């Protein structure tokens, strides 16, 4: 394997810990952080960490540690938490790999950027911090994907209005938490407190508008919303699914997929492009904001699953849907690394397809375990 220069790492800095909320690094301008110039970085899918938990620091693990700067994300910590009493073993593995913690950088107005930081820290400390702050964020994340879960056939018996109400209530709770934190900072950091309070107010309004519009649109287009599966309905309507799509191979995977759909109803009657189809022309929630590549990876990966390109199985079941969302999260954040390693071939194929179209230079490797 060959990795030259700083390719793929132009937006990675060495970060510290923000005193208010340690889930994200703050700054926005990468000039505020020293630029990382160390070894090529490697992001490991959870199934690779599983190998090292089961078999210890094998020769492969040592080679990864010595050849790369291994990095992990909050998505990694989320999966570790789901492992229950195995958590300490995963954290030991991260420490043995000398892994750094990767975080997104937000602006001082709490808006996303195309930058990340990686921080050297003890994995147990990072995990404890994650678990302390995770409940409300986890509740929000789980709530926001419920519409998506319903489109994959989950939430049987629940209406779009019911799901939207749940989402709005959870988001309101988070905004209330931010306002409470702002009040605590009024004397010591008045400008930051003002920004936080303003952000919470604006974000709440935008979320309510987005939920109202999306719910109205769904109700217009779905006849039996209580027993609806968007995946089944869509694939049946266009008469395209895994059987047709899984024959497509690189290069130009997304272009080849769009060729299959563009002359089908309803697309033949629309002035749509590939980017419309894969929902990457602009952000659906914040259409006036920059739409970064790592965010587009999320949209592409999810849509590939939806239309049936090497899809995850049984995503109408909550456990399988949660696993698919974690895969999507790993694919997105790993786009900041030089290399991504995974044992899941379907994950590899979808991730490579997204990276190829977006011009992301991260090299994606399939790990095969002999005698497994």
Give residue spans per PLM region.
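Active-site-proximal, substrate-binding regions of enzyme catalytic domains
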Residues: 13-336, 346-372
């Amino acid at each position: 394997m060959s990795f030259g220069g700083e390719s793929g790492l132009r937006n990675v800095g060495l970060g510290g810990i923000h005193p208010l909320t340690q889930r994200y690094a703050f700054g926005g301008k990468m000039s505020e952080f020293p630029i990382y110039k160390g070894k090529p970085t490697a992001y490991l899918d959870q199934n690779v960490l599983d190998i090292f938990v089961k078999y210890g620091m094998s020769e492969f693990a040592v080679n990864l540690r010595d050849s790369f700067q291994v990095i992990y994300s909050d998505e990694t910590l989320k999966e570790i938490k789901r492992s229950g009493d195995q958590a300490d073993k995963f954290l030991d593995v991260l420490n043995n790999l000398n892994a750094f913690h990767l975080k997104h950088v937000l602006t001082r107005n709490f808006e996303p950027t195309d930058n990340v930081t990686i921080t050297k820290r003890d994995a147990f400390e990072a995990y404890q911090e994650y678990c302390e702050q995770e409940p409300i964020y986890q509740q929000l994340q789980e709530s926001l994907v419920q519409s998506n879960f319903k489109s994959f056939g989950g939430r049987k018996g629940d209406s779009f209005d019911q799901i939207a109400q749940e989402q709005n209530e959870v988001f309101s709770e988070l905004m209330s938490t931010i306002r409470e934190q702002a009040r605590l900072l009024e004397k010591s950091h008045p400008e930051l407190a003002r920004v936080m309070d303003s952000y919470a107010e604006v974000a709440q309004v935008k979320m309510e508008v987005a939920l109202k519009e999306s719910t109205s649109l769904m109700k217009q287009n779905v006849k039996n919303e209580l027993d609806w599966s968007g995946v089944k309905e869509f694939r049946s309507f266009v008469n395209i699914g895994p059987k047709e799509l899984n024959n497509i191979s690189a290069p130009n995977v997304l272009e080849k997929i769009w060729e299959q759909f563009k002359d089908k109803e309803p697309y033949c009657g629309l002035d749509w492009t590939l980017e419309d189809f894969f929902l990457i022309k602009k952000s659906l929630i914040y259409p006036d904001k920059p739409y970064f590549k790592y965010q587009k990876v999320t949209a592409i990966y999810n849509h590939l699953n939806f239309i049936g390109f090497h899809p995850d199985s049984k995503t109408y079941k909550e456990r399988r849907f949660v696993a698919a969302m974690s895969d999507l999260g790993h694919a997105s954040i790993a786009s900041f690394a030089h290399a991504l390693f995974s044992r899941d071939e379907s994950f590899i194929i979808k991730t490579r397809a997204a990276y190829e179209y977006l011009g992301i230079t991260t090299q994606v490797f399939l790990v095969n375990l002999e005698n497994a």
